Structures are given as structure tokens and as C-alpha cells.
Amino acid sequence: MTPAARVKPEDFFTPDEWLLLSSRSSFKGLALLLHCWVLIGLAIATGVVWPITIPLMVMVVGTRQLGLFVLMHDAAHGLLHPNRRINDRAALWFGGSELHIYRPYHLQHHRFVQQSADPDLVLSAPFPISPASLRRKIVRDLTGQTFIKQRFGPLADKMRVPKSNESVWVLIALEVKAQRAFLITNSIGFALFTAAGLWWAWLLMWLLPMATWLPLVSRLRNIAEHALIVENSTDPLRHARTTHTNFFERALIAPYWVNYHGEHHMFTQIPCWNLPKAHWLLASKGITARIEVQGSYAAVLQRVTTEAVL
């Protein structure tokens, strides 16, 4: 299959502009990782001191869990730190233990974006959908059904139709091995919180956000990035969507400039913190008129559901 069309940075930016946009920082990426974990810690502490705030803290922590994924995504492109070893280790230790699995998967997504070989195409292909279908998806996310399906669905499928030479215990052992990083890190977290007498805080303000708010904001991110984007497009400016955000959307849905997805697909060498600058420069040159841009996440959801009922 032919790879997706690409743009040349020099067609859009001066050499000085491109140097500014594509420069990697020894400080900023690591500072963002620290920022993310500090916000998570402050949110959990707030919920412990003022339990009435726990519903809001679930949203804050879930969004920052997505933030860790966003920063791990930058690391998959080698953008978190100019030193590749530091880049990878920082992502593995503090951004997500599945970098080695995610990187080849994600780079294939970029290589064949919105084509049949794109592993993420299944996420955007079903759209448009009806408003009722979207509501059902949101309910599944917020009730933990999506989390359970993603974490335990593959094992359940294998146990339902096992191979003749595989026992249930073998299947369970293989699944535990596949998810050992997730199980180990969360077991350590639970043990530490339990030792501090705060086991309930781990359940309510780490596991619950992971099982509810994180699946929802991850779904909204996927919808905003590629839903209703034309498949097999030869225009590299139309491979993804950028969505403008307000303060509340950045705080509770789209952390660390993940909303500038059109620019990211055009220029994968730009770290996330420079994507707003890239957008501004492109806008000043009239280029954003050629990019799929929506004014808010609500506008995206309205579009992907309205077209289904026309």
C-alpha cells in the first residue's frame, strides 16, 4: 500500500520558523511530565481533604491520565527529550509502560493514516452515528464498561473459544504476562496508598478515573481527531482535524495541546508545546483555511451526529 502523502516543512515555514518549531527541549518535556504528576497528586490530596470534591477530582485525574498518554505519544516520536535514551526511559517510567508496543503501532497509523492499513481506522470508520448511539457510548464509558471490555475483553474472547491445547489457566497466565506492567504498577500504587491508610483514595481517585473519565475523554479525542475525515485523501492537510478549545476543555478534556492534531499529522517533528505556535503561523499565512478545523468539541460531536440523521 502507498504511504499517505506528506508535506514539506519548507513549503510552509521559513528556516528560522522551522528551527524554532521543531527544536526539542531538554527541559520542557520532562517539566510537562512533572506538571502532570503534580496535578494528579494535588487532585488526589484535594479529594482526601475535601471529599465533596471527589467527583471533580475524578475528572481532573482522568484528564491527566490522558495527559500522560499524550506525553508518551510525543516520546513515541522522539520529541519528549533530545536524548533518545532519556526520551524513552522518561516515557516508560513516568508516562506509560507500553511505549515499546505503542511506538510501532502509532507510526503505522501515521504512515497509512485514514487508509485500510491504518490500525486506528476502526476508531473513526463508524462515523457518522446517531445521537442515541453516541449517548450509549458515553454511558458505557462512564459506567466502566469500556474499561472492562478493553482490559478483559481479549481474555474473555479467548476463554469463550479456547484453542484445543490451551487450558483456562494457561490463557489467564498469558494475559497476566501481557498486562504485567499495568498490574505491577497499579499493585504498587494500591500498596502504597494502603500503607498510608488511604486505600479508598486510590480506588476513587486513580482507578475510578481510569475506568470512567479516561475512556470518555479518550473517545472524544479520537472522534475529534479523525471522525468524518475523508479516507484515502491525497491532500496531506486533510488527514486529521484540529479543534479549538477553551479553558475548561483544556482542563477536563484535551491536555497538552492534543487538540492540534491537524498540525501534528502535517509536521510530526514538532513537539506538542510548539503546536499552538505552528497553528498561529499557519493561520497568519492563510493555511488553516485548508485544514479541517472545528471551534469546540461540542461542535465536533454535533457534526458527527447531525450528518447521521440528514
Write out the residue ranges for each language-model feature:
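Juxtamembrane helix-capping/reentrant segments at transmembrane boundaries
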Residues: 21, 80-97, 118-133, 233-248
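Transmembrane alpha-helical segments that form the membrane-embedded catalytic/substrate-channel core
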Residues: 60-72, 100-102, 145-151, 206-234
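Non-catalytic, topology-defining segments of multipass membrane proteins
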Residues: 1-62, 71, 94-204, 272-310
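Histidine-centered catalytic micro-motifs
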Residues: 68-77, 102-114, 221-228, 255-270
